[in-house]
Amino acid sequence: MIAIIGLGYVGLPLAVAFAKHYKVFGFDINSERISQLNNKIDVTNEIDFADQKIKNLVFTNDLEELKKCNIYIITVPTPIDQDNQPDLTYLINATESIAKILKRGDLVIYESTVYPG
């Protein structure tokens, strides 16, 4: 099973794409966002639930549900600070969160907007 961490403009379409072939858990810390997605509402208009036949996708903000997964794809934002340096706070927080539930053999992938260097 696959966990997509962060359901913004990168994570949500990725979760939907993977859910066409695999069981996927879409995780976000924003409980309002999870509630909207569970009610088939996407205020960002990244996906159109009417056009999607999504059956293998569960939206959650409960980290415990992700223990079932063995692939974790982190897609959280990496904004630029006032010095034009990437703010890695979201990336670090997401990493520390899933580190608590990782098992031997699990795979973590960073699909981030951070620039190289």
Regions found by a protein language model. Give the residues of each.
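Structural/interface elements that position substrates and couple domains in central-metabolism enzymes
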Residues: 1-117
